[in-house]
From Swiss-Prot:
Organism listed in the record: Aspergillus fumigatus (strain ATCC MYA-4609 / CBS 101355 / FGSC A1100 / Af293) (Neosartorya fumigata)
Signal peptide: 1-21
UniProt keyword annotations, A-Z: Allergen, Signal
Region annotation (Disordered) ranges: 53-97, 113-167
SUPFAM superfamilies for the chain: Barwin-like endoglucanases
InterPro entries associated with the record: Expansin_CellWall, RlpA-like_sf
Protein name as it appears in the record: Allergen Asp f 7
UniProt keyword annotation of Signal present: yes
Amino acid sequence: MAPIFKSLALVSALFAAISSAAPVNLDKREVDVVWTTVTTVVWTTIDVTTTIYPTPQAPTPPVVESTPTPTPSAAPEQAEPIETSTQPETTKSQPTQPSVATFIPVAAAAAAADSAAPIPEEPAPQPATTAAPSTSTTTQAAPSAPPAANSGSTEKAASSGYSGPCSKGSPCVGQLTYYDTATSASAPSSCGLTNDGFSENVVALPVGIMTDADCGKTVTITYNGITKTATVVDKCMGCKPTDLDASRHLFGELADFSAGRIDGMSWYFN
């Protein structure tokens, strides 16, 4: 029995040594690794202003409206009454024939009645020949009418740009500002044009008086004793009827840019 106890004692001592040597961590926990991905989204708002201009197709119709179309209709109307005037001329030639017939009995008493028959036949073609030049006079009267119509239209066209408000005799007085002209063909001015505002003297008329026919017209501007001429290429949406919006080059020739807006500017259409 003694050897068994000894072996048991040795085994228990061995287990005690092993248990004391092995660390015991009762509070040990599993370590969890957590990966966190943070995404930051930044929204940036950019204000973009787009100006939409109407298509500049209106200037062409006034050019197409030419006066030659009514002139051919007027020529035949004048030719018809003139042709009626030729008819009484033929009636006047007819009484001459019986006057010749009155001489026939005198010739019949002197000679034979048969010889008098060919005599009235000869004067018959004579009034026909006189009728021919009368028709030629009608052809001369017809072309004389169209120039009169054309002269009236040219007088109206010449007087249309020189009367009314903002004319040389009655110039408009208002404010003058400056703007950046249209330089891109994709966004032209209201007249369908692009201009270099840093080198050209151009203006925009007030929207209240601007028409398509004003595109390309020139105006004379006077301020502080300085007079300049500019071409109309655009319309100003915020201008009063007597104001103008000028290119930078034109404004710089009349005043300093620091003024921004000048009063007492007078202008008129040329």
